[in-house]
Design a protein with these regions (language model features):
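Active-site-adjacent beta->alpha loops and helix N-cap segments on the catalytic face
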Residues: 45-55, 75-80, 94-110, 120-127, ...
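Catalytic beta/alpha-barrel core
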Residues: 13-15, 67-75, 89-99, 112-126, ...
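Conserved, mostly hydrophobic/aromatic
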Residues: 37, 93, 128, 180, ...
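Catalytic cores of alpha/beta
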Residues: 20-28, 79-83, 104, 121-131, ...
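Active-site beta->alpha loop and helix N-cap motifs at the rims of alpha/beta catalytic domains
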Residues: 7-8, 13, 18-22, 28-30, ...
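C-terminal helical cap(s) of enzyme catalytic domains, especially alpha/beta-barrels
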Residues: 152-156, 197-230
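Glycine-enriched alpha-helix->loop->beta-strand junction motifs that scaffold or abut catalytic
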Residues: 29-33, 86-91, 107-115, 130-137, ...
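Glycine-rich phosphate-binding active-site loops on the catalytic face of alpha/beta enzymes
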Residues: 38-41, 134-145, 185-204
Length: 230
């Protein structure tokens, strides 16, 4: 397996349509953008429509997120992709990685604004490389549910992905995230439970509290004088 570590910064996407979560995390500056799909919209009580996408796009940009990803839907993916493209320049279009999706990506001719999604195989990553799309989204936890060699498949995907960026999705725990990051994967779609917790540390919280308590205490004048003089 190639070691991709340090070839580019860590890119983290917030994988939810919950705008309250967007607002809570916007000022951290940790997230490259937002990823969504029809299931995530449904879980947030939203209809999947171009109108909804337009509203979410405006909200995301108002909060300072650099980009947002919307997935094609309906019976005419090309027409839907063109409508998503027209929402604005910060939109990335998610297209399922099957034969129909490859055709849509080719006709759209905007590889820098495409994510091929629902990726489970090395062959799908090869197709993404051939199409030179910006992102390819393999589903980690779902693949682990389906096969015993998911980690081996992911390592091969990483070796194949020379130009397209693997945007790792379907994560169920912070441990899964940390394990993949330690192996050189550097672009992730983080669901809300992980996005709000991965950077936290109870030990860090204790240390920060100790610093603040020390800052508020009256210093021992004798000890302070001794340290200054010595």
């Amino acid at each position: 397996m190639k070691n991709h570590r340090y070839t580019h910064p860590m890119d983290l996407f917030l994988d939810t349509a919950n705008t309250e979560c967007w607002t809570a995390l916007a000022k951290t500056g940790l997230f490259t953008g937002i990823t969504t799909n029809p299931l995530l919209l449904e879980r947030s009580g939203l209809n999947t429509s171009i109108e909804t996408y337009q509203e979410l796009y405006t909200k995301a940009l108002d909060l300072g997120y650099p980009s947002i990803q919307f997935q094609v839907f309906g019976s005419d993916w090309l027409q839907c992709a063109q409508a998503i493209q027209a929402i604005g320049p910060e939109v990335v279009i998610k297209i399922p990685a099957n034969e129909t999706g490859f055709s849509v990506a080719t006709q759209l001719d905007l590889p820098q604004r495409i994510t091929l999604t629902a990726v489970y195989s090395e062959g799908q990553v090869m197709a993404a490389e051939a199409l030179e799309v910006a992102y390819t989204a393999p589903y980690y936890a779902r693949l682990k549910d389906a096969v015993d060699n998911a980690d081996e498949i992911f390592d091969r995907m990483q070796d194949i992905a020379a130009e397209t960026e693997l945007l790792v999705a379907s994560l169920r725990s912070v441990d899964q995230l940390f394990g993949l990051a330690a192996r050189g994967f550097a672009t992730f779609a983080l669901p809300q439970p992980i996005a709000t917790e991965f950077f936290k540390s109870s030990l860090a919280d204790e240390a920060i509290s100790a610093f603040e308590e020390a800052a508020q205490r009256e210093p021992n004048k004798v000890a302070t004088s001794s340290r200054v003089g010595g």
